[in-house]
Amino acid sequence: MNTVKTVRELRAAIARARGEGKRIGFVPTMGNLHSGHAALVTKAAQRADFVVASIFVNPLQFGANEDLDKYPRTLAADQERLLQAGCNLLFAPTVEEMYPDGMAVQTRVSVPNLSEGLCGASRPGHFEGVATVVSKLFNMVQPDLAVFGEKDYQQLAVIRAMVRDLNMPIQIIGEPTVRAEDGLALSSRNGYLTAEQRATAPVVYRTLQQIGDAISRGQRDFAALVADGQAQLAAAGLRPDYLQVRHALTLRPAMVDDRDLVILVAAYLGNTRLIDNLYVHLDEKTA
């Protein structure tokens, strides 16, 4: 696996792969990689002949009081994990390489509607930063396909909409959330948790499961289910940011006759913000 730091080197390496008739897969990351990221690379390697990953902690998607400065940078360990997962090329640019004229004058990409509410409400500007950097990376790599984790459900929806609306010829593949044995969704930010907090954290997924089970049994009072779930999270010592039931494709608030639902949650455990989601499909008997 080669590592390059400039757009020129990146494009030269991809041009060579294209010249050999290879199908290009792409996995954008912010580094501090775990088994969930490895699963994305493995999926890309299954679908493509040449896998490109990027590591870039994107300042545009961090708010003023978020963890940009303390977000872990673990390049050597990340390179080893990417190599083991089947990555062929790593693009690890600097901020100056990505935003040579500075971020203040950078053209922005905004995806309306899907970027609003949920994480977009508590992290204003976040999805504009995500859409902007991903569109730049897509233009640099020009992949045939790109793989994103379903843990960041709203982000995946935003990327799908951007690709569709801007006519980008890229297949977007969602990879199921990778979880620890106790159900906690793997996240680079889990490393911020104390041992006691880590023992508490699986309540997030258990809460989603309980709401999902109730919906599958025919419960349609979504407001009551959400209220119970928020109370359960609070009783465990978490501060819910949001807990909502939405239509799985459009992310509008769920209606009683919807068959494809997603339950989405964000909650603070100490200073660490945990997010997760659970997809629920209802057949005709339960819908």
Curated annotation (Swiss-Prot):
Could you say which EC number(s) this protein's record lists? 6.3.2.1
Molecular functions (GO terms): ATP binding; pantoate-beta-alanine ligase activity
Q: Does the keyword Methyltransferase apply?
A: no
Top enzyme class, one word, equals ligase
Name the residues that bind ATP.
30-37, 149-152, 178, 186-189
Q: Quote the catalytic activity from the record.
A: (R)-pantoate + beta-alanine + ATP = (R)-pantothenate + AMP + diphosphate + H(+)
Checking CDD domains in the record gives: PanC
Q: For this UniProt entry, what's an example GO CC term?
A: cytosol
**Which key words tag this protein in UniProt?**
ATP-binding, Cytoplasm, Ligase, Nucleotide-binding, Pantothenate biosynthesis
Task: Give the binding site residues for beta-alanine.
Answer: 61
- Biological-process GO terms, alphabetical: pantothenate biosynthetic process
Location comes to: Cytoplasm
Main subcellular location: cytoplasm
The active site lies at 37
State where (R)-pantoate binds: 61, 155
Pathway named in the protein's UniProt entry: Cofactor biosynthesis; (R)-pantothenate biosynthesis; (R)-pantothenate from (R)-pantoate and beta-alanine: step 1/1
Which family does the entry's similarity section mention? Belongs to the pantothenate synthetase family.
- What's the subunit arrangement here? Homodimer.
What more is known? The reaction proceeds by a bi uni uni bi ping pong mechanism.
Query: What function is annotated for this protein?
Result: Catalyzes the condensation of pantoate with beta-alanine in an ATP-dependent reaction via a pantoyl-adenylate intermediate.
Q: What is this protein called?
A: Pantothenate synthetase
What is the species of this protein? Pseudomonas putida (strain W619)
Quick one: which gene encodes this?
Answer: panC
